């Protein structure tokens, strides 16, 4: 049977099967199976090495977005610059990695501004500093924002937004998450706030923040539907 899957850990919460099955139905694709597969850094090499011709694609979530990269035959230049892969496409025996988070974030911001009939943001704060934050940095660069503030518990490391910034040619200003007043000050000053944090982590900040008119907020968490 032809199949695709979302891989990561934990994976039981993922709505990727619902999204993809709905898309397939719209496209008239029938007879394909979409799976949730629990995979982590330890199990990933064996899983990737065992993929057959019946697999048509993988959606990749944490903690596999960076771990999968050395296991692939080819990586799209944007995904290499970001330092994270969220989509794997097998073709003629070649496994290629891509990053669609960048386009998704940029498109969401453009759509929000278009619906509100407002100009694109000129400044931004990113909450978090790992793989999705790196994608957000690249998306902001596409929107013309080349200097962003990043608030996180820690910075650094090969998979961090700090490392991605140098590859992407953008600049970041670092604010420690523990410095609540500094984070709030940064949040009040920018046009756009992008949270790449797990569900609930940004709630204390959201409860202290008075969103000003025209400010755009993007939370990558999609479950629950409404976040703080």
What are these regions (language model features)?
Residues 9, 128-130:
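Glycine-rich Rossmann-fold phosphate-binding loop(s) that bind the pyrophosphate
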Residues 29-37, 147-149, 170-174:
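Short beta-strand elements in bilobed, periplasmic/extracellular small-molecule ligand-binding domains
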Residues 2-115, 224:
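Phosphate/diphosphate ligand-binding glycine-rich loop within oxidoreductases
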Residues 171-228:
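Rossmann-like adenosine-cofactor binding region
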Residues 133-134:
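N-terminal Rossmann-fold NAD(P) dinucleotide-binding loop
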Residues 118-120, 142-144, 207-215:
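Short, conserved loop/helix-junction motifs that constitute active-site signature segments
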Residues 145-169:
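NAD(P)-binding Rossmann-fold cofactor-contacting core
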